[in-house]
């Protein structure tokens, strides 16, 4: 397990630590699991990702003799796929529904009359998906600047193929004039599709490819009536809050032994993140943050 130290867009370090991680979907995690994981692993550091909490937790506190460290807290957005497509659409305003229809129609017109999007879920198909999605991902600023694109290594491809054999993966691609312009990758566990990677080519942003692909995928999933949830993964953002009409407030909770090494790790992390936040706030006050983002994207694209 690693805890990345980031300053703005840059990852400064990723200390790797061995620890016991609770392996449960966030929808099944309860407060008592903190006690249970400590009982099961009394001599190990422990981590509970996306633990639902009723209110924000202090970043550092004590819990059962451990150093409880909470680096991230966020709304985790999701969609209940059992409610039906009509009911889901009804949770959007009439203005938003009309906007979605316009976006789909605009992309269809640019594509010659129909939107060309495809689903991949077989061992052979998922390899084709990966190859084409990597072509898109490699050109996005998220990958070139943030190293946050679809992984390209052999081990990841082998994992995709294994998941496809077990029926536990979906890949989606959106095409324009025969060329991929957007992708969505979703692993599947316990009947839950997880939004893992979404990317699109910035030069086609006027066609809203990421939004259109997400909308069409969700429509198909509702009609398929096979899965329980679409989980937008940890973290927040406009895309997730637009589509994920339900959410739970969650925290990543580290239960660490109170050693000097763990204390140094925690307080170093806090120092870096606080300094990064101060720098971001200063740029915002000076109205330079948007300009800095545009320059960073241009540098990545150049």
What are these regions (language model features)?
Residues 88-89, 144-145, 202-204, 221-223, ...:
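A short, structure-level motif marking secondary-structure boundaries and short turns
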Residues 28-31, 84, 122, 258-260:
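Intrinsic-disorder/low-complexity, polar/charged segments
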Residues 2-12, 65-84, 228-288, 292-295, ...:
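Active-site/acyl-donor-binding loops of N-acyltransferases
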Residues 31-40, 124-127, 158, 162-166, ...:
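Polar/charged alpha-helical tracts
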Residues 4-72, 190-248, 254-255:
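Acyl-donor binding region in acyl/amide transferases
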Residues 53, 94-109, 133, 170-175, ...:
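A broadly tuned preference for mixed-charge, low-complexity surface segments
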Residues 1-15, 51-206, 301-302:
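A conserved beta-strand-loop-helix scaffold within acyl/acetyltransferase catalytic domains
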């Amino acid at each position: 397990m690693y805890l990345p130290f980031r300053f703005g867009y840059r990852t400064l370090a990723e200390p790797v630590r061995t620890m016991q991680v609770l392996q449960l979907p966030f929808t099944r995690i309860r407060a008592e699991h903190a006690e249970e994981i400590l009982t099961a692993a009394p001599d190990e550091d422990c981590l509970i990702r996306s633990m639902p909490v009723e209110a924000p937790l202090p970043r550092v506190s004590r819990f059962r003799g451990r150093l409880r460290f909470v680096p991230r807290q966020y709304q985790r957005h999701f969609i209940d796929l059992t409610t039906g497509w009509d009911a889901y659409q009804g949770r959007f305003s009439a203005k938003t529904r009309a906007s979605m229809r316009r976006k789909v129609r605009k992309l269809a017109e640019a594509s010659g009359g129909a939107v060309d999007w495809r689903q991949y879920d077989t061992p052979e198909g998922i390899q084709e998906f990966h190859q084409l999605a990597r072509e898109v991902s490699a050109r996005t600023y998220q990958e070139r600047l943030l190293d946050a694109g679809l992984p390209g290594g052999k081990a990841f491809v082998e994992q995709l193929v294994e998941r496809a054999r077990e029926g536990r993966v979906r890949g989606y691609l959106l095409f324009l004039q025969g060329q991929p312009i957007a992708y969505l990758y979703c692993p599947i566990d316990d009947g839950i599709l997880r939004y893992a990677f979404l990317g699109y080519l910035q030069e086609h942003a006027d066609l809203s490819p990421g939004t259109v692909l997400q909308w069409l995928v969700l429509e198909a999933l509702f009609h398929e009536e096979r899965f329980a949830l679409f989980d937008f993964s940890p973290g927040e953002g406009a895309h997730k809050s637009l589509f994920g009409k339900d959410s739970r407030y969650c925290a990543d909770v580290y239960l660490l032994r109170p050693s000097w090494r763990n204390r140094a790790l925690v307080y170093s992390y806090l120092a870096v993140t606080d300094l990064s936040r101060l720098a971001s706030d200063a740029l915002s006050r000076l109205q330079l943050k948007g300009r800095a983002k545009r320059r960073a994207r241009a540098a990545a694209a150049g």
